Amino acid sequence: MARVTQYQSNFTVGEIDPLLLGRIDIQQYASALEKAQNVVVLPQGGFERRPGLRFMLDISSHLGGSFTTLDGIRLIPFEFSTTQSYMLVFVKNTTSNTRMFVFANGQQITNINGSGNDYLVCALGDIDLDRMYFTQSADTLILVHEDMSPKSIVRGGSNSTWTFSTISLTSPKHAFTLSTSNPSATITPDAVDGTVNITASSSVFTSSHVDQYINVLNGFGRARIVEHTSGTEVKVVTEFPFFEKDVAIASGAWELETGYEDVFSSTRGFPRTCTFHEGRLFFGGSKSLPNSLFGSKIGDFFKFKAHEALDDDALFVTIATDSVNAITAMRSGRDLQIFTTDAEFFVPQADLDPITPSNLVIKNATRRGSKEGIKPVSAEGGTLFIQREGKALREFLFSDVDLNYQANNISLLSSHLLKSPRSMALRVATSTDDGDLLLITNDTDGTMGAFSILRSQNVVAPSEFVTDGKFLDVAVDITDIYVVTERTINSATKRYVEMFDDQRTTDANIQYFSGATSPDQSLPSNTTCSNLSHLEAKTVDVVRDNFVLTDKTVSSGAITIDEAPSSFVEVGLPYTVEVKTLPAEPKLSSGVVVSRKRRILEASPVLDRTQNIAINGFEVPLETLPYTMGSVPTTFTGRKRVAPLLGYSDTAQLTFTQTQPLFATVLGVEYKLSTGQ
């Protein structure tokens, strides 16, 4: 019987796919976990209890009865300035109108536009909000959907002043039903190129011919009609110059091309995606032309109709490949990046030249395809996107070696945490020793995948967030992470807006303290904590003045605690923390121990500011002597020994849990292992 001492110094691989449990040969095994539930893996190596969720708003009554949570709710961040940013919550109320709620600095903005309502009515029409795409420039948010004419939302002079309007676009033209005719007349141009007046020998032109084309068959010349003067005279702009001026082109030697109509219309649909890039507003795809790219005139964001193909003119190009390539997303980065259902593209810019009609080229980079409805996010020079089938998280990153983009699978070790992803958001690192936190909600079971990312140290550490109910949507306002949850409250289905709070340890919680603003409450002067109707009939955790009280059940929107609080009370739903190490596989001279019985004799976790932690069901004593009865929980930093741990097993694993809603951080763990024959 062999005894060895093992030390797991970090957990920076996070929770790995069950399919990898047999891969004791890979380097990542030593830093991985079998389960990481409701914890955040730190880029320094440890893990900590995830933040609690602060209750913000019940939006259940605003969601129209016929709409599902999948198409009727949407979170969109909006950054107005370097000091002012917002979270906008869109809730579909009727087939015509959507209500927009505004949050700033963790508080709801009320009395929008002095209307007495705490929401702005937005006439978005009967669209699926989860397919609505957005971008912004300064004080204006642009919203697009293939079944909705583009909209704008503008913040006015204060937090509560907002304007919703339909954008008036100058649409490009496309021949959806091209037809040609040969009018019985000669035509004579008065110039060779540029803006040209054309005179016909008989009345052949009508006002409907504006934006249609004259094409010379025998010779040179192609021009777009821009103005109808009379039946015998039109003004055109040449695409190809005429051979000579003031010389009649014979009847039958030219044709009139018709069938060109607005690309963006109620008949042909509207843009699918949008982004700003190098002074232009780009639309990626439309309902009828899903694989086309449209760029506005520089500095004139809503003008998409080309004129003379000058460098600042509008752009219109179609991705022509051997597959459909409907555009699902775009991002302005090193280049203009274009994500489609079948592949990833970019617009190269040689020598950093700006994009113009004459040099516009779309290059294919990779062929993975991205999932529609999930907007890619920027992270450390790359772009993270969900692959088309929703089974992989990929990083679209330019390689200086290959001089091309790559789409590496960064969820290879943890693809089981992606279960029909619905939304994705990134909270960028907030300090020099912090990492980015990528959050992905799953439709299948309402869980949330959480990926701690620090690419400079090759850290991609996933864990899983679960709550009493489902996570429906997630978005980030600078550092504040908002979610929409679905919970069953008193036998009714509710949808709440909530926000992660590092200082709280329960879900859908409110706190009572001096100076609180709604939905938090002022500190009660007695033992009754009220205004808890959003948790009616639920069993809740209660923390009073850092003491954890016995569980309470909310009745008539209130609970009764043991004594009046002196500083604060937190009341919220409990959530389970569970972290399980992989089976211990020491490297012995006799070989592997996969088939042997094993026992962990003792464990010594390294803790940081921890108030409660248990290992294999044994609560770790954190108090130090002399101990005072009735004192608040100890906040411990250091190493604690837990022994003896009883029982042989086939795996020999450590399971970290918590018995109370308190803070916990584990930096590493040493354990002594005994192996049988």
Give, region by region, the residue ranges found by the protein language model.
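N-terminal beta-propeller domains
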Residues: 1-112, 152-156, 161-193, 253-331, ...
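A short beta-strand element within beta-rich, extracytoplasmic domains
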Residues: 597-610
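Beta-strand-rich solenoidal segments
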Residues: 105-181, 222-223, 440, 447-497, ...
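Aromatic/His-enriched, Gly/Pro-containing loop or helix-boundary segments
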Residues: 107-139, 245-261, 312-326, 364-368
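Beta-sheet-dominated scaffold domains
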Residues: 131-134, 280, 321-541
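Beta-sandwich interaction modules
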Residues: 123-133, 562, 628-653, 657-661, ...
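Autoprocessing Asn-cyclization modules and mimics
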Residues: 110-111, 155, 162-253, 406-417, ...
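Surface-exposed interaction regions enriched in Ser/Thr/Asp/Glu
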Residues: 244-265, 554-592, 657-676
